[in-house]
Amino acid sequence: MRLAGMCAVLLCAAGLAMAQESDASIQGKIIALEKLWNQAYKSADTKALDSILDDSIVLINDDGSIQTKKEFLASVKASNAQEQQVAPEALKVNVHGNVAIASGVLRVKGVEGGKPYTRRERFVDTWLHKGENWVCIATNATPIH
């Protein structure tokens, strides 16, 4: 009986150690996906964006409007804005099992209609481990003035 109890304790401890390593690994994956999203957005790469956004994603823009994935991809494709920089100033990832929350501040610089612009926004992206991949299921951006 003692042997079974000791084995159970050791298995739980091993599981906790694996979970901690797993969280760090997941955080790295989510950071890489956030970088991919920023680069794809900057270069209007709708194929790359399509691969990381869940079909049911809810996108809440910095003006409060809501878009579906289809609407978002169409707006990226049709935009006449030329993003010169899309870079996080701060990024934090919290892992909760098969869900990861990425939050931070994003700085965007570009030109639209011949006029330069700079904006900063606080964002929260919710990522879900679905099958073999992580996909974003919700995103919210709030302007920082």
Q: Language-model features: where?
A:
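A beta-strand edge to alpha-helix "cap/lid" segment located at domain peripheries
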Residues: 20-52, 56-145
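Bacterial N-terminal signal peptides
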Residues: 4-15
